[in-house]
Amino acid sequence: PLHSSAASDVYKRQNQYRGVNHPRKSLDSRFASSNLPLRGAKGWNYEGGVRVPLIVHWPGRTKPNSKSHALVTGTDYYPTLLEMTGLPALPEQHVDGVSFLPALRGKAHDRGAIYWHFPHYSNHGYQSPGGAIRLGKYKLLEYYEKGSVQLFDLEKDLGEQHDLSASKPDITAKLLKMLHDWRREVD
């Protein structure tokens, strides 16, 4: 159910709220926080809940108006700042992060897999406990209670509309194993 708010009233009146199984294809321009074409929103494992733009301003070091599609996560900031300032890496303090300084310099940056673990229900009531892994162009989501998975090719399907888990069982199994191994490692 929708929470009582002015925004949800507008959603209801315009019949644009369709839930996780029927994501919106368009949204009235009054919704400035729309993250279309991404699926989901804050508190979801879908890209609409985990994808955030990163803007870096480093005069004399980064090229103005440049873009990178490098995949980074919050744990990557610390090792990146250490490398930017020339300070020594302290692996015991940042075992999860990878410096993305190469990406800031316009070079290739492959940081490996990124993991998410949400062992709780979301505040909106649609996201059940689960986890996810992103490796390259693929992202796998696992829902713990049902034991179900979804696999998406984010290069071809950024909106996460086409589940490939049945048609790509090898990739699904590989990513699911990596996700389970990671969860055991950090538990």
For the regions a protein language model found, what residue spans apply to each?
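Short glycine- and hydrophobic/aromatic-rich loop-to-beta-strand nucleating segment
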Residues: 54-56
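C-terminal structured subdomain/cap of oxidoreductase catalytic cores
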Residues: 154, 168-172
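Single conserved hydrophobic/aromatic residue that forms the stacking wall/gate
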Residues: 1-14
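Intrinsically disordered, low-complexity polar regions and short flexible loop motifs
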Residues: 157
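C-terminal cap/loop subdomain of S1 sulfatases and analogous C-terminal strand-loop tails that border
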Residues: 20-50, 61-70, 75-154, 185-186
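Short glycine/threonine-rich loop-to-helix capping motif typified by GTGT followed
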Residues: 12-22
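Carboxylate-dense, calcium-coordinating segments in secreted/extracellular and ER-lumen proteins
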Residues: 160-163
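Charge-dense polyanion-binding interfaces
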Residues: 174-187
